[in-house]
C-alpha cells in the first residue's frame, strides 16, 4: 500500500503531479482589426474567443446576451411579468447580469424582457472586517449598484427585513443582526464550517426577503466556473444529496420562491470581454472572501478548479455539465412551515428541539432527509455506544450479548426511534 499521504504535497495535494498541457490553450485573443467578423462579414473583428471564430463588438454582445436570454426562454420557468428579486454583489459577473437585464428592458416590445426586477444587496461585509473598513466597502458597492437605476433594497445576512438603498441611516442599520451573526459564526472552529454556514444563511436570507417583497423568483449571477466549484465542494462536504439543486438552473426546494441561475452558461472569458466592449462603462468590485487564506475544503477545491480553468478550460465545463445529469429528491414544506424558520435560532443555546417533529426536510439547508437506514450513521452511532457501554471487566458472553443489543439500538436511533434504557444503558 502506498505510504505517501496528502500532507507530503502541502496544501496543493498531488496536483503538482498532473502534467500541464504545453502550450496552454489561449482563452481569447484580440485581433488586429483587419480581419472581418465571421458572423456579419461587415464589421472588423475585435476579439476571438477560445474555439470560436473572430467576432466584431456587436456580434459578440448579441451572442452573450442571447445565451442569457436563451436560458430563460428555453426553460419557461419565469413567467411573463413576474417580480424577480435580483441579487446584487458587485462582482464582475453580477454587474454583467444587471446590465443584460437593463438592456433587455430597453428593447422593443417583441424583444423586451418581460420581468419586473427588484434588486437587493445583502451585505456580508461585516464578516472579518472592522467597522470602518465595512463602511467603505458598503459605500463602494452602493455606488456601483446605483449606476443601474433599479428599485433597490439593502439588508444584511441573517436579517429578516430590508430597507431602500436611499435610506439615510443605511450604514448604521442592522447593528444587532451583525453582532448576532458574528457571535454565532465565531463559535465555529474550522474555516470549512464557517464558509458553509455563510452559504446556507445567505440562501435563507434571500428567501425571507423574496417573501417580504413578494418575488416568486430569485436571480443569482453564478457562472459555470462558480458552479463547478460548488459541485466539487459539495461532494467534499458530504452534500451530495442536494448537489443537483445547488448547481441547477432552477432550485425549486421552495416552490414559492425559486432560485434561478440564468448566467450558468457563461464563462469568465465572456464576462471579461463583455465588460470591455459593453455599451456603457461598467464599474465592479473584486469580492474578497474573509477566509480565503484559511485552510478549508472550499478553498482547496477553488484553487484546484481555478488551476483547471487556466490550463484545461474544457475540463471545467465537463465538471459543471456533469451536474446536469444528476437528479435530486425534493420535499415540500410541512405544516410546520419551516420556511419561516429563523436559521440563526438553530444555533441558540436556549433552543429546545421538538422531539415529536415530523419534518422530512433539513431545517438548515431544506434538503430531503436521508438518515433512514444510513450505514454511515449506523457505524458512527454503534461506535459511540461501544465506547460508552462496554466495560473491560465484562465477560465475553456479556460483551457479545451487549453488542447485539447495541446494534439494534443503533439502528433504532439512526431511524429516529426511541431507544429503551436511555443514553448510557
Curated annotation (Swiss-Prot):
MF-aspect GO terms: nucleotidyltransferase activity; sulfurtransferase activity; tRNA binding
First-listed, main subcellular location of the protein, grouped into a coarse class: cytoplasm
Organism: Culex quinquefasciatus
Record protein name field: Cytoplasmic tRNA 2-thiolation protein 2
Biased composition (Acidic residues): 1-11
Family named by the database record: Belongs to the CTU2/NCS2 family.
Keyword RNA-binding: no
Chain's role: Plays a central role in 2-thiolation of mcm(5)S(2)U at tRNA wobble positions of tRNA(Lys), tRNA(Glu) and tRNA(Gln). May act by forming a heterodimer with NCS6/CTU1 that ligates sulfur from thiocarboxylated URM1 onto the uridine of tRNAs at wobble position.
